A protein has these predicted regions:
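Small/polar beta-strand repeat architecture
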Residues: 3-7, 15-29, 38-39, 53-128
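Short coil-to-beta transition motif at edge beta-strands of beta-rich domains
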Residues: 36-54, 163-170
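Residues that flank catalytic or metal-binding motifs in active/ligand-binding sites
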Residues: 60, 141, 167, 183, ...
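Oligomerization/assembly interface segments of phage tail-like spikes and tubes
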Residues: 121, 132-151, 199-214
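Short acidic (Asp/Glu) patches
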Residues: 123-131, 188-191
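Exposed beta-sheet edge/beta-hairpin loop segments within beta-rich domains
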Residues: 129-138, 158-163, 174-179, 193-200
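Acidic, glycine-rich flexible loop segments
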Residues: 149-180, 188
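Short beta-strand and beta-hairpin "edge-sheet" elements
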Residues: 172-218
Length: 219
């Protein structure tokens, strides 16, 4: 049994550097290896992957692991499934995260979306008229982050700036024990404080993911 409580989790976010780092291919391995120019990606860099040839990996964010000549590990990524990752990856691009801004004075986050949707119907030849369902798409995932109002905090102006630009960012959740989750998507922020008697004023950041998270496990 390994129950884990979220107490101590800290969210943060970072802009994405516009400079594109070409990758000629990504291997089928766990963790996957990206072929890049020597010294273009360092161990510990957080990167977004743009890889049209493997849609299951496109728009996902992770941390770079060990480097070797011309390759770097993409931690938390397993590309050995030949259904999800058929053939070869083809060329793509990595983009590094800028400096992360950590959030504090956090309330309890809430998540929504990700629910599987279905097509429902019956088959004409089935005399029982039994209904069948086929999975279609999943709803977009959102994370809502309550933040207690304090305009002097570094994150306040940084969130306002990100909201105004409307550009995708990398969201990070540092969990107790060293595990880290990374997402890539859009972050909006309402900096106007909520007001209720005998309660701290609050603001709300809302993140919409462009792809599933990547979990990088702690040592």
């Amino acid at each position: 049994m390994a129950l884990k409580l979220p107490k101590g989790t800290q969210f943060g976010f970072a802009p994405v550097v516009s400079t594109a780092i070409a990758t000629s291919s990504i291997s089928k391995a766990a963790p996957a290896l990206a072929s890049v120019a020597a010294n273009s990606v360092d161990t510990g860099d957080v990167v977004v992957i743009e890889l049209p040839g493997w849609p299951a990996l496109n728009n996902r964010a992770t941390r770079a692991g060990a480097e070797a000549t011309g390759t770097v590990e993409l931690l938390g990524i397993d590309t050995t499934d030949t259904v999800l990752f058929p053939g070869t990856s083809g060329a793509g691009v990595l983009r590094k995260a800028g400096a992360f801004v950590d959030l504090d004075q956090q309330g309890d986050p809430t998540t929504a979306g990700g629910e599987q949707q279905y097509w429902s119907g019956t088959l004409l030849e089935d005399p029982t008229g039994r209904q069948v369902q086929l999975p279609t798409f999943k709803n977009a995932k959102t994370i809502t982050l309550p933040l207690f109002y304090d305009p002097k905090k570094p994150w306040y102006s940084a969130l306002k700036n990100v909201d105004a630009k409307g550009e995708p960012v990398i969201l990070r959740a540092k969990l107790v024990g060293g595990d880290v989750l990374y997402w890539y998507g859009y972050l909006s922020y309402n900096g106007d404080p909520t007001m209720a008697a005998n309660a701290p004023m609050g603001t709300t950041a809302t993140f919409t993911a462009l792809a599933d998270s990547i979990l990088v496990e702690g040592a």
